[in-house]
């Protein structure tokens, strides 16, 4: 499906902006956007880069913040910041559940379950994906940690493929089922072929309102009914 030209075009959209946020659709130059509704001024987006390269100048990172001492790769750094977003997400849904239960409506308990359902779905999906290695999320902790045969593991102790899948699904979870555009650059890197095949469906399970724009060299990523959504780079470049 190609990569280089698509990513270059994508960079026109997100150049100079931090990953994850909003940008004004009417201020972009050289990129034509079609938005819905037509008068939309802002677009929420996330960008996921999948390569697990060593952190540049690791000593400087550790001196900057001692809590970063466990981080060795770019995926570790992404997970560190996603953990912070995950804590905020849990506070947010907790406050919504409390407000719902205090409202006194007869369906308050069902609504509270609906609010908390995406988090449980995320945990169930991760447990299923990691089941072959016996890892399960510890659901009593606020930060994401895993249990494996009685040992507690941090996300930074996962394999590259496990970290990558966790980054993707955690990014989608904290979008809180809001409309987002999710850019992904070769998400199949380090992922087992079965995970590649399930990836898009897993993302849409957590956020049905996300629009996915990705580049890939793997047929498995689009094998599950997405072949008709593929654009060849050669068809859109000179």
Predicted regions and their residues:
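Hydrophobic, Leu/Ile/Phe/Ala-enriched alpha-helical segments that form helix-helix packing faces
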Residues: 17, 31-35, 122-130, 203
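Short, small-residue-biased leader/transition segments that mark boundaries at the very start
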Residues: 1-7
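Conserved catalytic motifs of the protein kinase core domain
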Residues: 2, 43, 179
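Non-catalytic, alpha-helical, charged scaffold/linker segments
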Residues: 8-99
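Extended helical coiled-coil dimerization/tether regions that scaffold
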Residues: 87-157, 173
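Switch/communication elements of ASCE P-loop NTPase nucleotide-binding domains
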Residues: 124, 133, 138-238
């Amino acid at each position: 499906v190609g990569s280089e030209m698509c990513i270059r075009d994508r960079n026109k959209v997100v150049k100079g902006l931090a990953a994850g946020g909003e940008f004004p659709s009417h201020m972009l130059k050289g990129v034509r956007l079609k938005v819905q509704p037509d008068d939309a001024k802002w677009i929420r987006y996330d960008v996921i880069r999948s390569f697990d390269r060593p952190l540049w100048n690791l000593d400087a990172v550790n001196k900057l913040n001692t809590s970063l001492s466990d981080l060795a790769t770019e995926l570790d750094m992404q997970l560190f910041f996603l953990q912070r977003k995950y804590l905020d997400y849990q506070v947010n849904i907790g406050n919504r559940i409390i407000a719902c239960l205090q409202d006194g409506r007869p369906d308050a308990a069902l609504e509270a379950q609906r609010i908390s359902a995406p988090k449980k779905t995320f945990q169930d999906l991760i447990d299923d994906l990691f089941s072959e290695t016996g890892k399960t999320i510890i659901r009593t902790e606020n930060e994401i940690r895993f249990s494996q045969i009685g040992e507690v593991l941090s996300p930074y102790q996962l394999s590259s493929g496990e970290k990558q899948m966790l980054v993707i699904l955690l990014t989608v979870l904290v979008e809180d089922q809001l409309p987002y555009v999710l850019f992904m650059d070769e998400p199949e890197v380090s992922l087992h072929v079965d995970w590649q095949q399930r990836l898009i469906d897993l993302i849409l399970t957590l956020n049905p309102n996300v629009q996915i724009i990705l580049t890939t060299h793997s047929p498995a990523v689009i094998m599950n009914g997405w072949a008709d959504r593929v654009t060849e780079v050669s068809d859109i470049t000179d």
